[in-house]
Amino acid sequence: MKQIKILENEYWWGVNAGRGYKMPFDANTDISFSMGDNPEGGDQYAPLLLSSKGRYVWSEKPFTTTFKDGVLTVDTEYDVEFVEGCETLKGAYLDAMKKHFPFNGKTPDKLFFTAPQYNTWMELGTGQTTEGILTYAKSIIDNGLGAGVLMIDGGWQEQYGFYFTNARKIPDLKYLTDELHKMGFKVMVWVSPIVGSAGHEYKQIRDRGYLIRNAEGKIAIRQWWSGYSAVLDLTNPETVAWVRGEYKKLIEEFGVDGFKLDAGDQGFYRDDDKLYQPMLAREHTYVFNELGAPYPFNEYRAAYKFGGREIVARLHDKHHSWGEKLGINSLIPNTIAQGLLGYAYCCPDMVGGGQIDTKSEVGIAGAIDEELFIRWTQANALMGMMQLSIGPWRILSKESWEIVKKYIHLHREYGEKFWALAQNASKTGEPIVRSMEYQFPGNGYETIVDQFVLGDDIIVAPVVKKGQFEREVHLPEGRWLSDEGVEYDGNTVITEKVPLDRLCYYKKVK
């Protein structure tokens, strides 16, 4: 156990991107959490805590974090490293990154950054069919958005984990990928470490020892959002070779370009599971991350201690709400937290929210809030990635759709900027999306969570509250040119009118 007295005006970030909306933590914070799954959205984890005063905590193993009575307690039976003297949040991050998760010079594919991504989930749910997917793709093109990465989400296969049998939903996957390629899309398909626990294929991999067994030595059947299933033992090299063989077949014979690797959270594993290579439940997520990292077209939601690596890290499925836990208000702080944990190539979930309601004709529970959808698009527009799912052309009024389209196009216009920042991240470890405190320390910006810095020279200040048409914007020292062409002297706070069709952003004048 390590106890650290929190300094005056000291703020802390870390451990779990899904709790970013609660950050930063300070001397008045009363919270305790482990590295187990976060019911508010697991997202990405790292055994790392960073301070605005240039201090940090690192451990090679999971730990429990407690902030109480002005003291930070790190509870673990393993070694804990406590470092001081890095001066700032940025200094602490860079020191920890260089020592413990240096970036490897690799990035996901450029297309993730230079074009919007599209996902079939909110349109089709688990009813993924050839006709439905092609109709969705054609609508994207017909509505002037242009091609990009297209992800065929969960439910496209007949049985989880087995891709080539009883293909009634998509009887000819090669035909489907060929048609999508003709439209200009790159095609990813949903995969996971979960396998259906019935049938000939299941019996084969069971008998080969590819599945996790519980403490009693029986095949572990775990509950998840689609029922009960077995789980692959990815600590076994033979299991990994089999899975990669399946992926290779999907790529070479069926035209798939890459994979959305879902699930893999700690909740699928137990510390006392019988594995080929014993490890803690939390660490199995790392092995899952290793599985997909070599594919340039990849996407993960669950990650552990994988900072510095070339994976797309998506935020947990968001609700269509203004909330701070799983709504629009979590986007900026959680994305900032991702970057501080070493996950630079981050995607802020689907515009409007990716938590599906299968009872709704439009995939979203309740009525569509057009103001929310617009503000969500604006909040994502100048982040490094944007992912669309539900077709805004069919759920919004003409006026709202035109505003949304404007900011989708703005995202495309900044594609080369995003790509340059991704390449920079791969070499320096610097996040693409940064907090004001990270980039401009010493100005009292620690608790600002409704604006962010793109790279080092663009401040973005979206609206994330319903009915807000005026907002304050903090501008640091220097000269700043607004989206409306107005130049401001920095080291000030300005008040801006923000009608529904405006996103405030400011470029530093060189």
For each feature predicted by the language model, list its residue ranges.
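Catalytic-domain carbohydrate-binding cleft regions of carbohydrate-active enzymes
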Residues: K2-K507
